[in-house]
Regions:
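Zn-dependent metallopeptidase/amidohydrolase metal-coordination segment
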Residues: 185-222
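His/Asp/Glu-rich mid-to-C-terminal helical/loop segments that flank catalytic regions of hydrolases
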Residues: 212-257
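Generic non-transmembrane alpha-helical segments
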Residues: 133, 137-149, 234-245
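Active-site/ligand-binding-proximal alpha/beta "capping" segment
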Residues: 141-181
Length: 286
């Protein structure tokens, strides 16, 4: 088992990893956001990758989602814990609350959501966008390590917007009218790509603000960064607990997600495309 972690540098610095080393990974989808750091925690292999780069130089649109997921797959990762900063769409989910969402609404516009195409067509089910087993595991970890002052929410819908601008008030009010729970910029296409790569994937979302639906409320970078920093210790504790308690007999339907989804005969797939997707789909193309 190798557990991938996608998030900010604060997570890597806080996790008590041993025997660490970095690997520079090249992929058919470009360079990842940064090198992959590998180490051990509680006898488990861990691979860490900062989504936005070490110095947060990639916007939510420009983050190297395909290369990042491919890189984690290539170093042996089979499950991924990610972290996100999000705004709250509910009065009862204040800043500094942790949410383990189980649904996504995709409002992104300019991101490639698939590894496939160019001669290979894959239609994959995505009804449960986060791995249900990983959602439960993260929610249990959050319940175990947070105190009475840190609210945690099990389940909920994450609406993913393109960014990098925050929502308009009309957009924020619309999201609330749909009954959605949090709004952020980074879980898509990450969750879709993780499923295509047959990785068990879920996220810990830390609430930084109330978005702009509240009267006279504006989202500012200062507020977001302040609350993101306040959330960091709780998120770190959840991730460490989740890694330490990850069961050896953990099972996920995501690990066979490509089965029966490839709609192109193997002999019709261009050789260059087949080589590009071999790590992801090779066993289904033999």
């Amino acid at each position: 088992m190798t557990i991938g972690v996608i998030g900010g540098s604060g997570i890597y610095e806080a996790l008590p990893l041993e025997n660490t080393h970095t690997e520079t990974v090249t992929t058919p989808y470009g360079d990842p956001s940064d090198d992959v750091t590998l180490g051990e925690l509680a006898g488990k292999e861990v691979a860490f990758l900062p989504r936005h780069g070490e110095d947060h130089q990639h916007t939510p649109t420009d983050a190297q989602y395909r290369a990042n997921i491919y890189a984690l797959k290539s170093v042996g990762v089979d499950r991924v814990i990610s972290t996100n900063a999000v705004g709250s769409l509910r009065e009862d989910l204040p800043p500094q609350t942790l949410v383990i969402p189980d649904q996504i609404y995709d409002r992104t516009k300019h991101r490639s959501p698939t590894f496939f195409g160019d001669g290979i067509v894959v239609h994959m089910g995505f009804a449960e966008p986060y791995c249900p087993e990983m959602v439960e595991h993260l929610a249990d970890a959050a319940a175990a390590v947070t105190d009475a002052e840190t609210k945690t929410e099990r389940g909920g819908t994450y609406v993913c917007i393109e960014g990098p601008q925050y929502s308009t008030r009309a957009e924020s009010e619309f999201y609330r009218s749909q009954g959605w729970d949090v709004v952020g910029m980074t879980t898509i296409p990450e969750a879709k790509l993780a499923r295509e790569a047959e990785l068990s994937y879920a996220t810990v979302a830390g609430i930084t603000d109330y978005d702009v639906w509240k009267q006279d409320n504006e989202v500012t970078l200062e507020e977001v960064l302040e609350n993101a920093a306040a959330n960091q210790d709780s998120i770190n504790a959840v991730i460490e607990r989740a890694i330490r308690t990850m069961p050896e007999d953990f099972e996920s339907d995501a690990w066979s997600a490509l089965e029966g989804t490839i709609n192109t005969p193997t002999e019709a797939i261009p050789a260059e495309t087949r080589e590009r997707v071999d790590l992801l789909a090779g066993e289904y193309l033999d």
